[in-house]
């Protein structure tokens, strides 16, 4: 009997095809992992290779690669967004200028959370606030067990929203699920954030990457045709979704398939920000991130 292919991916319009009982990959049936929210799949993937294929946050992949995890990155962006609006304060709390966050406490689910990577990069790039000048109050450990957090990272219990509501932090970084599920309107602290987001996009010629597609390296090496077929299936769905949207917002514009200029730009900025913030400590190039894909799927893709 042909072995089932295990895949961990969030339910998006462009991943709905994975739930079709008739969908197979090179003759292999697909078993979709139950991981909700999807970031619950990230630690099992990087620590124990629990899945054959997994959606993975780009910051987690950068750390996993540095730690030597045998996982390969495919040039498929499953989610992304601008993140100026992700830095928020509690309604009714004191207003604060982003430039004044140095020396203050800011909440974030984990220091290695990708939304936090982007927000810290924005603070440094646009407001002159270095990541090491802020105390980052976290509620979860890194997905990569061997990662050592900077000394200005603290841990608290509960959820980031609870920490923010209690006033233990002056602001908090919240990813899309937390923002979408918040009770009441949180207040973005970056002024004119919509305009600032579009200006960032114009300056960098990309939309920030949150999650990409990864595969166990041994599967890629042993069955490149299988991985290629799955890669093409994801690509077809992404291209169809983008083509169907005549006025795409940033979450649709962020979707990528293939090695495009926008993908390369997004990966390079993620690398730069990660090095600045000690999310990773070893320099790496975009070509090195995509080396497994290029060697094994370059001709097939």
Which residues make up each language-model segment?
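Short, glycine-/small- and polar/acidic-enriched structural segments
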Residues: 6-121, 125-129, 136-139
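Conserved C-terminal helix/tail region of periplasmic/extracytoplasmic solute-binding proteins
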Residues: 209, 279-301
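Pocket-lining segment of extracytoplasmic ligand-binding domains
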Residues: 147-242
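Short, structured patches in soluble enzyme cores that scaffold and shape functional sites
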Residues: 91, 110, 138-140, 168, ...
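Alpha-to-beta junction loops
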Residues: 47-56, 69-70, 104-107, 151, ...
């Amino acid at each position: 009997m042909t072995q089932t292919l295990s895949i961990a991916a969030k339910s998006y319009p462009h991943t709905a095809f994975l739930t079709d009982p008739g969908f197979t990959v090179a003759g292999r049936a697909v078993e979709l992992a139950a991981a909700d929210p999807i970031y619950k799949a990230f630690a099992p993937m990087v620590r124990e290779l629990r899945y054959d294929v997994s959606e993975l946050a780009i910051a987690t992949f950068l750390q996993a690669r540095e730690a030597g995890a045998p996982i390969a990155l495919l040039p498929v962006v499953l989610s992304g967004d601008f993140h100026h609006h992700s830095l928020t304060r509690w309604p009714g709390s004191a207003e604060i200028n982003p430039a004044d966050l140095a020396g203050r406490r800011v909440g974030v689910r984990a220091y290695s959370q990708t939304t936090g990577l982007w927000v810290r990069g924005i603070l440094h790039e646009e407001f002159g606030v270095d990541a090491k000048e802020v105390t980052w109050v976290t509620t979860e450990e890194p997905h990569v067990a061997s990662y050592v957090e900077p000394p200005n990272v603290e841990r608290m219990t509960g959820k980031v929203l609870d920490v923010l509501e209690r006033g233990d932090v002056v602001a908090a970084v919240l990813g899309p699920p937390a923002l979408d599920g918040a009770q009441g309107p949180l207040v973005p602290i970056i002024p004119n954030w919509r305009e600032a987001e579009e200006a960032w996009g114009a300056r960098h010629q990309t939309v920030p990457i949150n999650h990409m597609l990864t595969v166990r390296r041994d599967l890629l090496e042993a069955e490149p045709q299988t991985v290629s077929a799955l890669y093409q299936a994801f690509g077809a769905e992404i291209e169809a979704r983008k083509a169907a949207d005549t006025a795409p917002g940033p979450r649709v514009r962020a979707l990528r398939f293939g090695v495009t200029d926008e993908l390369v730009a997004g990966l390079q900025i993620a690398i730069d920000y990660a090095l600045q913030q000690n999310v990773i400590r070893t320099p790496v190039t975009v070509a090195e991130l995509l080396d497994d894909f290029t060697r094994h799927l370059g001709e097939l893709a």
